[in-house]
């Protein structure tokens, strides 16, 4: 590395830079605290560890706040969202009814199916003759 010019020159008019003193590192309290933290780390003790009960209580509180926010968001639904939900529920009910009817028809005995087909064909023939 290149050395600065002021090292070679013995010019008394120049102000030579000095290394700044870090007041935090020179303080006795900081040194003691640093030494204590190093010792605790070697032992495996972490200063930020909280008691288990406190952790559980904080987690419950966070969960409760999240649930409250979700409930408030659901309560603040707009009229459009409410109408869409109603329509969706109606469509689901209609689909369930259709499925029930199909299951009933599939589970019905064969003679009931044939009888229904005969009635329909009889009605269709009657309508065709009237037209």
UniProtKB/Swiss-Prot annotation:
Segments forming a coiled coil: 61-112
Protein family according to the UniProt entry: Belongs to the FAM107 family.
Origin species: Homo sapiens (Human)
Pfam family, one: DUF1151
Entry-annotated residues carrying N-acetylalanine: 2
Keywords, ordered alphabetically: Acetylation, Coiled coil
Protein name stated in the entry: Protein FAM107B
InterPro entries with a match to the protein in the record: FAM107
Taxonomic placement: Eukaryota, Metazoa, Chordata, Craniata, Vertebrata
Annotated positions of the N6-acetyllysine modification: 50
Basic and acidic residues: bias regions: 52-78
Cysteines paired by S-S bonds: none
Domain of life according to the entry: Eukaryota
Region called Disordered, residue ranges: 39-78, 100-131
């Amino acid at each position: 590395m290149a050395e600065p010019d002021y090292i070679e020159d013995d010019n008394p008019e120049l102000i030579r830079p000095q290394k700044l003193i870090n007041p935090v590192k020179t303080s006795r309290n900081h040194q003691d605290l640093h030494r204590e933290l190093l010792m605790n780390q070697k032992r495996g003790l972490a200063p930020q560890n909280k008691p288990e009960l406190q952790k559980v209580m904080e987690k419950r509180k966070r969960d409760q706040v999240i649930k409250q926010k979700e409930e408030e968001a659901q309560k603040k639904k707009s009229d459009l969202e409410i109408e869409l939900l109603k329509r969706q529920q109606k469509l689901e009910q209609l689909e369930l009814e259709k499925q029930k009817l199909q299951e009933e028809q599939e589970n019905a005995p064969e003679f009931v199916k044939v009888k229904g087909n005969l009635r329909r064909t009889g009605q269709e023939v009657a309508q065709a003759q009237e037209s």
